[in-house]
Amino acid sequence: MPIHNTSIIHSNSLIEENAIIGKNCKIGPFCYVSSDCVLEDNIELFSHVSIVGKTLIGKNTKVWPFASIGHYPQDLKYKGENTELIIGTYNKIRESVSINPGTKGGGGTTKIGNNC
């Protein structure tokens, strides 16, 4: 499991085997990060955060409780195509936010810029 040795992961969180966790990340209790996710350096996940799918979160981003990131698109035309979610650096994702990957009709990628 490529988790940088400076990162701190709460014992009640689940990080799947191929997930990549950068330097100085803090992952609070009851978080889930699936195998295709990349968290760059200095990411902080507060409790109860779920990150799945082909998702990249840029450095120095904070994610507050109950955020749901990278789950299947809500577009009813989605049929399991390869999609991704890219979140830039220095972002603040607040409580109970849902951010989904793109759909085939929109190019398959959702991108969020920096400092949002």
Model-derived features: positions:
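Internal nucleotide-binding/catalytic subdomain
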Residues: 99, 105-107
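A structural motif detector for beta-strand N-caps
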Residues: 1, 7, 13, 19, ...
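Short, flexible, glycine-rich and Lys/Arg-enriched loop motifs at helix boundaries
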Residues: 72-82, 105
